């Protein structure tokens, strides 16, 4: 348990993780954990497979992390939303990524509702950063902007608001 706990502490000290993400990483076999690059000894030429991690021990480590407030899905969701929105992603993509990371749907919805991000303004900034201050007006170029913003995870209404505000 001590090895698993120290692994969890190391992972959580680097960044926040969701419970499902931490559980998956703890259950995974460490890839050549003791090996160093360039130091090949005769005994390390054929690494021995390690025994699978006991799920009960993982549960104990997860409970210990919750007990010490090291693991918190709500905090993870808030920080993840802030991080991804600063990188220019929209709410739809962030929601999808959080679901893939194992964050509960209701928790994701609540975190997105609590964040104070103006997604229309965010979409406008992303479009201007990619296509310049003068957004295209012809249909073909507008479609290119729209596809790009949809890929980045913005909703259709947010994209249309850019052109409504741009026209005024």
UniProtKB/Swiss-Prot annotation:
Keyword Cell division: no
Any one GO cellular component localisation term in the record: cytoplasm
Subcellular location: Cytoplasm
Gene3D superfamilies according to UniProt: Winged helix-like DNA-binding domain superfamily/Winged helix DNA-binding domain (1.10.10.10)
A single GO BP: regulation of DNA repair
Superkingdom assignment: Bacteria
Keywords annotated in UniProt: Cytoplasm
UniProt-listed InterPro entries: RecX_HTH_1st, RecX_HTH_2nd, RecX_HTH_3rd, Regulatory_RecX, WH-like_DNA-bd_sf
Pfam families linked to this entry: RecX_HTH1, RecX_HTH2, RecX_HTH3
Primary location recorded for the protein, binned into one broad class: cytoplasm
Protein's UniProt keywords contain Cell membrane: no
Family membership noted in the UniProt record: Belongs to the RecX family.
Function: Modulates RecA activity.
Protein name: Regulatory protein RecX
Organism expressing this protein natively: Serratia proteamaculans (strain 568)
Gene name linked to the record: recX
